[in-house]
Amino acid sequence: MQSQNISDIIEKYLKSILADSEHVEIRRSEIADLFNVVPSQINYVIKTRFTIQNGYLVESKRGGGGYIRIEKVNLVDDADVLDALIQVIGDSITQRDAYAVVQSLYEDDVLNRREAQLILVAIDHETLGLTDRDLENSLRARIIIGILNHLRYES
């Protein structure tokens, strides 16, 4: 049996709440208390697991009544979200982040399994075959942005 680390457990917990609702509003300290971790652990989970590349929008409000709101979004159906994702990608995207974008498109039923696998092969380090990592990430970004723009205008 494979053990899970606390970040995986917190992520699974938040995703289970999101499965029943369009969004979740949490108080960082309450979730930290629930899992007996420091609040910065909750920040880490949210910053690394609930990114726009993964199909989530996160809004936080600081202060006494502060909260963190996490919303699962369909990357292609919302032009503003798509624009934000393209802006985040910018001129460069790592293989890991690009895989997360493709996974989100697959989970949103924008891509079928075969299409997602073909894209993953096309943006893979071995396929691109470049020794310059910056150039590789730049080329990968251009491919992903091209796909996203095509999906935007597909009927």
UniProtKB/Swiss-Prot annotation:
InterPro entries: CtsR (IPR008463), CtsR_C (IPR041473), CtsR_C_sf (IPR041908), CtsR_N (IPR040465), CtsR_N_sf (IPR041902). GO terms for molecular function: DNA binding. Keywords: DNA-binding, Repressor, Transcription, Transcription regulation. GO terms for biological process: regulation of DNA-templated transcription. The lineage of its organism: Bacteria, Bacillati, Bacillota, Bacilli, Lactobacillales. Homodimer. It comes from the Bacteria. Disruption phenotype: Disruption leads to increased expression of ftsH, indicating CtsR is a transcriptional repressor. Belongs to the CtsR family. The gene is ctsR. This is Transcriptional regulator CtsR. Disulfide bonds: none annotated. Binds to the ftsH promoter region, leading to repression of its expression.
